[in-house]
Amino acid sequence: MNICVVSTFDGTTDDFMQIFNWAREKLSTSATDMEVGVIREGKVITMGNVTDMEKFQEIMTSEKMKEWDAKHNCVDVVYSLEKQ
């Protein structure tokens, strides 16, 4: 399933890239083609293809991710994408 995640947070793009790079390594068995587009400081779009939703959700709801989200007041809006 192709997804798009719009993340709004208090912090810098570098802050986001640190957690993204941590997650991307963990997600290597459950998602492919993960890419980030920067809208502005504090807002990014992440797109990718989730191949194992259960494993993906496990990583995205991990304690490390929850702590980062709380620290940076991160709100994620997730969309599924379908090629037309």
Regions found by a protein language model. Give the residues of each.
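Short S/T/G/P-rich N-terminal loop/turn motif that feeds into the first structured element of a domain
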Residues: 1-68, 72-84
